[in-house]
């Protein structure tokens, strides 16, 4: 028995531990860049995005680039709640180049992958998976990007698994989006990334 336990300890000590990094400190927007006039602020430890005076697109991008990673976060949509999580993205003004994992109202393909200013929808979840979304409640999203493969989960439900050469060549930050049109408010918390 002692030999078995010692063997397990030896194995565990040789496996490199990959640290999870918080993207949001719960205090301020340190480590993030705001793009556009939409509102991004901290309220009682939560990250909030809200339509601003121009009712346009807005983005909040990490200062750091992430290539291969596993990201988990929680979001709560209020009103329309159309938003998204961009991966390997760059933002110039309010024009983003990259891929969005959709965060949207029921029936609008949350968890699907959309390429902005490019090919449009690359993959949408099967319609029956829409029931995983809890509108007006806290939802947990997980996004895993390795090489040319992207996967998403919503509240532990696998939403998509997709391979795309162009995504595999992408470089950039993780960014949150608020859609244009006005009247949108989304709260975010527990944004944790594990670089792979």
What function would you assign to each model-found segment?
Residues 20-196:
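Carbohydrate-interacting regions of secretory-pathway proteins
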Residues 4-13:
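Sec-dependent N-terminal signal peptides
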Residues 15-19:
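Sec/Tat signal peptide C-region and signal peptidase I cleavage site
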């Amino acid at each position: 028995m002692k030999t078995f336990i010692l063997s397990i300890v030896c194995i565990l000590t040789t496996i490199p531990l990959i640290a999870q990094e918080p993207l949001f400190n719960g205090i301020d927007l340190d480590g993030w860049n705001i793009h556009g006039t939409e509102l991004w602020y901290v309220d009682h430890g939560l990250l909030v995005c809200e339509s601003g005076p121009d009712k346009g697109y807005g983005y909040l991008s990490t200062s750091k680039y992430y290539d291969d990673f596993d990201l988990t976060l929680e979001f709560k949509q209020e009103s329309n709640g159309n938003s998204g999580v961009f991966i390997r993205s760059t933002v110039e003004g309010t024009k983003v180049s990259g891929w969005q994992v959709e965060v949207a109202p029921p029936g609008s393909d949350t968890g699907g992958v959309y390429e902005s200013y490019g090919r449009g929808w690359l993959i949408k979840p099967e319609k029956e998976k829409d029931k995983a979304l809890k509108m007006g409640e806290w939802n947990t999203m997980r996004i895993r990007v390795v090489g040319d493969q992207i996967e998403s989960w919503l509240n532990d439900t696998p939403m998509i698994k997709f391979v795309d050469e162009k995504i595999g060549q992408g470089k950039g930050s993780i960014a949150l989006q608020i859609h244009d049109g006005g009247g949108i408010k989304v709260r975010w918390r527990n944004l944790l990334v594990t670089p792979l």
